[in-house]
Amino acid sequence: MLVKQGFYMHVIKFLQKYIVGFVFISGVIVMSGVGVIYFQVKDELPQIPKNLRYINQQPPTEIYSRDGKVLKILGDRSYMTLDLISPHFQKAIIAVEDSTFYEHHGLDPVSILRAFYKNTVKGKTAQGGSTITQQLAKNLFFSFEKSYERKLKELLMAFQIESTFSKPEILEAYANQVYFGKGAYGINRASQVYFGKNPSELSLLQSAILAAIPKSPNKVNPINNKEASIHRASYVLQRMVDEGYIDETQRAEALRSELDIRKANRKQNPDSYFLD
């Protein structure tokens, strides 16, 4: 009996080493391949500015009704430095979107392999694999066209961004340009639209609610679908527990706390229904 147990333990340890080795080698191959391709096509890539915040400072688009009243302002982005954004939100968005953000260099090979396995082998499509830096590159420099060429350039731009800017600068730029639904681009506008407060004032639950939105801005925002929003926020909070940002008690307290959603202003602007 002891011989069998020893044999099984030996097999398990061997398989563990094999899997870890496979993942490591695959990661090295991916990183090396991307590096080689980068030097081949780097002249075709967009130029990165000296300061990422300048890209976010685009003039907003105003939508008017037939009688000349402003119905909605799209792309109204007031840039917030990281110290003006709730630490709860910073931790929440990292936990749910890119848990290895402070460890990778723009690309997370393990996440890509995991996403490939779940999407291809198991037939699931919920797994993305894109890091925060990749998402930033896509949102700032590329269209949302789905093609291998666009994805490759996105990866290369992510490397370039990581080699040019610090992690806080990248996180700050991401928080200021990501789309939160309801015409809200950036954390400042999202905080005002959904909760009527500044980003620094967001509670833990409100931070989780906002961090949950970018995955599906129109379906998982608290104005369109409060139940789905809270369900997704519960998952975000669990990810924060998994990453050691909060404990189970804090998660439970957050889910019991008051959300204080700002009501959609449909009575004053009934035409805004067509803008959702």
Feature locations, PLM:
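Juxtamembrane regions of bacterial inner-membrane/periplasmic proteins
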Residues: 2-276
